[in-house]
């Protein structure tokens, strides 16, 4: 990279040294990624890969980015959330291990904390723009929430239609910004997005929300390239979603509010892998109530000792409300109007539409006041206030620093192996949505055992034969529920 490298946008390059120190600490806590670097360094399986990343620009993500680069990839990056970027991590990635703030020499990264919606989608566009590539774009996408994948698909769709819908048809502010971006980039006869998509070998998707989008596109017959659903890898969903959320949910609430959780009543919406972080609230001494639509998850919650009921039954009684569903319109403005004075409202699902922030802003006479970044009170005309964290977006990343490095090593090892799988074996993956092969899922788990002092028992050949598996695995069928 030349000394005049300016293909990036971060808040403050002077934070790079601090970021580099934190990255070094994180590497020690991320044995999976570091083992993959050592194993594949010589083979360079991602040589020739142009990876566009749209994933929270944190210290842990910095270790992922530098792992992809160590395996031969070129990388361009944006965050997948307007509040989740850690400025020192972004600066360290832009500067690189061998650069300085005056001479940055590393990865084009476009991310800073507190982006506007226009800035956020501009950053996503920049991450997808590869000036010197044959198609002007990437040949791989690493996504979290599906925004980079969505932008490519919408661009191709509207080029095929010959026009972009009017911004007057936008469903919300974010949709309006997307339409404005595509109106700007799609001119008469333009095939920018179609050309960009033509060389993409696949996408690896990190989270439930993005996976839902992929399955919808597959169902509708519009998916343009193969995808690996990393979210449903066991070493992701049963570790990142479970153990990570237990840690970062409490961290976010504590940093945002400094309230004592013990003795309070908390409502957790959803009891899937993320919602099971309810356990951490209980561990702090809260009385936890769960809402559910799924009878199986509701039964699990009840047998784990939680009261399971509807929001309507408890909306005026609880102190803390946390959405975890990945769905929309979970808490509406009318619900928030019924809450107790200074009730805390937050989300660890994904997008900001789990909580009706648009509806809240339209309540006649309501007043929004910033207490500190990503902590706002909303005062209703009767004087009652509620506290909303991260403007309804991910509180564990907006108000805190996300999941710990060790658990993210699992998820990001999954991502790295999924990228290698799609990039090196395109013939094995026709367009569709796939899960990470079981042997790779087990490999990721193995890479983390030594750090915890785990010693595995080894099957004898006759034992393996008896249960119909190989001595070295995989040990479970794809449909086994851990």
UniProtKB/Swiss-Prot annotation:
- What CDD domains does the record point to? SAHH
According to its UniProt record, where is this protein located? Cytoplasm
What is this enzyme's EC?
Answer: 3.13.2.1
Name the pathway it acts in: Amino-acid biosynthesis; L-homocysteine biosynthesis; L-homocysteine from S-adenosyl-L-homocysteine: step 1/1
Q: Keywords for this entry?
A: Cytoplasm, Hydrolase, NAD, One-carbon metabolism
Q: Where does substrate bind?
A: 58, 144, 206, 236, 240
Cellular component terms (Gene Ontology): cytosol
This protein's source sits in the domain of life called: Bacteria
The family database entries (SMART domains) matched by this protein are listed as:
AdoHcyase, AdoHcyase_NAD
How many cofactor units bind, and how? Answer: Binds 1 NAD(+) per subunit.
Cofactor names: NAD(+)
Q: Give yes or no: UniProt keyword Amino-acid biosynthesis.
A: no
Q: Which residues bind NAD(+)?
A: 207-209, 241, 270-275, 292, 327, 348-350, 396
Gene Ontology molecular function: adenosylhomocysteinase activity
GO annotation, biological process:
L-homocysteine biosynthetic process; one-carbon metabolic process; S-adenosylmethionine cycle
**Recorded catalytic activity of this chain's protein:** S-adenosyl-L-homocysteine + H2O = L-homocysteine + adenosine
Identify the Gene3D superfamilies for this entry.
Answer: Adenosylhomocysteinase-like (3.40.50.1480), NAD(P)-binding Rossmann-like Domain (3.40.50.720)
**Family the UniProt entry places it in:** Belongs to the adenosylhomocysteinase family.
Q: What does this protein do?
A: May play a key role in the regulation of the intracellular concentration of adenosylhomocysteine.
Question: Which PANTHER family does this one have?
Answer: ADENOSYLHOMOCYSTEINASE
* Name under which the protein is recorded: Adenosylhomocysteinase
Organism lineage: Bacteria, Bacillati, Actinomycetota, Actinomycetes, Kitasatosporales
Q: Gene encoding this polypeptide?
A: ahcY
